[in-house]
């Protein structure tokens, strides 16, 4: 199960990565839906939180949705992501507080695999300012996150180029107000809330997946660029939903359900103000996704995609 893929398409984190040069390609086919009631519209845009330079410019459909939106909504308010307070909260949640090293809770085989990974990725760790020995200070979930993020950076994916960062900057430049569907503290709690068994599984799978990550992650990135909802669902959700139903519900379903009333408030607001909502692609896909949940509530929902063969 590709938990790393879920991070790229679902959860934000405090990340650092080194961008690479890439050839310009056709604009990505957008994961963009328009949800309407009698007077207002909400545009839902599925983000890939780490992208490449060649993923820009975006499609004209996305540019038009941004231009027509009076405000933007993200998973976390952009101003909070950049705050030192959120970094401090992440550090406090991630640090081990009982004075024991990480290895004390790892099975010997997993500890050995982590050591081997550290040796092979020392340069990547140095780039984010985290020497290998410092990992012993943290909880397994955070080290799993570090493993995944270092590997993504080595594969050329950059959080500073993700759709969230891009549109946060564009909104600021054009004076459009921004807000969030949840707080940074809530996102940290989703990660830190994994029980010990889930944390060890997450760390182990992060290490395993890093051995063969380039091909797998490139397939997922290509699916996002192609706007292929079926390939994205298969890559990000199918195995997770089957193997870790509690974690899937915690990371995806519960958050989607919590977001629905906030999105509906935008639709119910007086006037004719449109909103662009930018969230991880996973949250918009499948029967558990925000798109189908809003459709089930009776809203008019259509996919906005000039490059798609159908409007579904």
Please annotate each region the language model reported.
Residues 1-10:
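Bacterial N-terminal signal peptides that target proteins for export
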Residues 29-247, 251:
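Structured, acidic catalytic/metal-binding patches in enzyme active sites
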Residues 20-25:
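Boundary at the C-terminal end of the N-terminal hydrophobic targeting segment
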Residues 245-312:
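A cross-kingdom marker for long, charged
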Residues 9-18:
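Bacterial N-terminal signal peptides
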Residues 27, 54, 255-259:
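Short secondary-structure boundary/capping elements
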Residues 9-10, 36-38, 269-271:
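Short hydrophobic "helix-edge" motifs at membrane interfaces and signal-peptide entry regions
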């Amino acid at each position: 199960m590709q938990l790393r893929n879920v991070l790229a398409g679902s959860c934000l984190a405090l990340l650092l990565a080194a961008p690479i040069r890439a050839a310009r390609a056709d604009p990505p086919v957008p994961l963009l839906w328009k949800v309407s009631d009698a007077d207002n519209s909400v545009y839902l845009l599925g983000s890939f939180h780490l992208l490449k330079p060649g993923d820009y410019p975006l499609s004209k459909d996305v540019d038009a949705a941004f231009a027509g939106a009076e405000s933007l909504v993200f998973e976390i308010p952009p101003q909070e992501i950049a705050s030192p307070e959120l970094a401090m909260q992440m550090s406090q949640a991630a640090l081990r507080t009982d004075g024991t090293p990480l290895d004390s809770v790892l099975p010997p085989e997993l500890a050995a695999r982590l050591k081997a990974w550290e040796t092979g990725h020392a340069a990547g760790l140095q780039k984010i300012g985290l020497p290998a020995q410092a990992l012993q200070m943290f909880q397994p979930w955070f080290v799993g996150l570090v493993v995944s993020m270092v590997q993504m950076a080595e594969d050329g994916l950059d959080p500073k180029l993700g759709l969230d960062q891009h549109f946060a900057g564009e909104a600021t430049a054009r004076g459009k107000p921004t807000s969030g569907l949840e707080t940074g503290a809530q996102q940290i709690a989703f990660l830190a809330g994994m029980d010990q068994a889930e944390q060890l599984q997450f760390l182990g799978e992060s290490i395993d997946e890093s051995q063969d990550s380039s091909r797998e992650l490139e397939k997922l990135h290509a699916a996002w660029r192609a706007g292929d909802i079926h390939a994205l669902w298969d890559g990000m959700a199918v195995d997770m939903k089957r193997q870790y139903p509690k974690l899937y519900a915690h990371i995806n379903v519960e958050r989607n359900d919590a977001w629905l009333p906030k999105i509906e408030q935008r639709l119910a607001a007086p006037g004719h103000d449109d909103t662009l909502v930018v969230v991880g692609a996973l949250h918009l896909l499948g029967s558990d996704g925000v798109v189908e949940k809003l459709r089930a509530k009776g809203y008019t929902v259509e996919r906005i995609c000039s490059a798609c063969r159908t409007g579904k």
